Amino acid sequence: MKLILQEKVANLGNIGDQVVVKPGYARNFLLPLGKAVPATPEHIAEFEKRRAELEKAAAELLAKAKARAKKLEDKTFKITANASDEGRLFGSIGPREIAQAITEAGIEIEKREVDLSQGPIRQVGEYEVPLRLHTDVSVNVKIEVAPENSNS
């Protein structure tokens, strides 16, 4: 299926690129999320009129992501969790908890931007966690997992 990309899509193309993708990828991902439109003559003409404003919006998103990445550089965020004496967590720390800790520190992060491809954190310690703020911007932050002080 031939499409025109409305925004940059990782491993596919940039704004305005005409790409050929499998119909399922187009139907289930690109079209419903507004990342692309079918490459009909009408859409091609309409896109050429709107190209400048779409590119400007994409540049603004990139600038915002770079600004957030600058704020996040060399930062350590502490998360406390209930843990055993050996340092194993009761439960785990996933993208939601990491995003919440960073947001509470004053930098807005969504859980979909946290890349825990190695799986959730299950031990006390320091971890380097990558954040994907934009298709072109990623930054690593340190997450320090500490046991909760329990005096039982």
From Swiss-Prot:
Superkingdom, natural source: Bacteria
GO molecular function: rRNA binding; structural constituent of ribosome
GO annotation, biological process: translation
Pfam families: Ribosomal_L9_C, Ribosomal_L9_N
GO cellular component: ribonucleoprotein complex; ribosome
Keyword flag Endoplasmic reticulum: no
Annotated keywords: Ribonucleoprotein, Ribosomal protein, RNA-binding, rRNA-binding
Family assignment from sequence similarity: Belongs to the bacterial ribosomal protein bL9 family.
Functional summary from the UniProt entry: Binds to the 23S rRNA.
The name this protein goes by in its record: Large ribosomal subunit protein bL9
Species assigned in the record: Coxiella burnetii (strain Dugway 5J108-111)
